[in-house]
Amino acid sequence: RDRGKPDLAKFTFRASNKWLTCGNNQTSVKGFYGAGQEFSHPKPFELEADEPEVLLGEGKAPGPADYVLTALAACMATSVSYHAAAKGINVESVETSLEGDIDLHGFLGLSTEVPKGFQNITVSMKIKSDATAEQLEELANMSPVADTLKRAIPVKVNIEKQ
């Protein structure tokens, strides 16, 4: 750890997305900037998203809401593992299940009073570890994705008409 170079801890992650049809999209993750340099994945990660048929998709892939829950679960489990290791805490297993509630009245434009996205997310974690319950709570709260979802952050949208 070089505390004299705080910029080494600043990262920028990138993804590009192409809409294909109806609820079907293809997202590519090619690289990121961090630790003072650019990184490229040896092969871009290609992620497909779709909506279930009841939401006018074809049900060929997880939907965007599923990916939000997936990102949260993966980040929380990884954060527990990394921070436990840094503190010398043994973790044998982490299992996470999540539920997110959405009222589509907002998304469908049927109500301006209902949010368009998740109204709440419940995370249940089973962690086999020698840590105390208080330590496990602290470890789970280190997740950057959980922090992002808990805070209201600006999302800047740039639109280029073609």
Question: Which ranges hold each PLM region?
Answer:
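Conserved phosphate/anionic-ligand binding catalytic regions in large, soluble enzymes, centered on
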Residues: S79
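Alpha-helical metal-binding/catalytic segments enriched in His/Glu/Asp
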Residues: L72-M76
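Extended beta-strand/beta-hairpin segments
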Residues: R1-T70, Y82-Q162
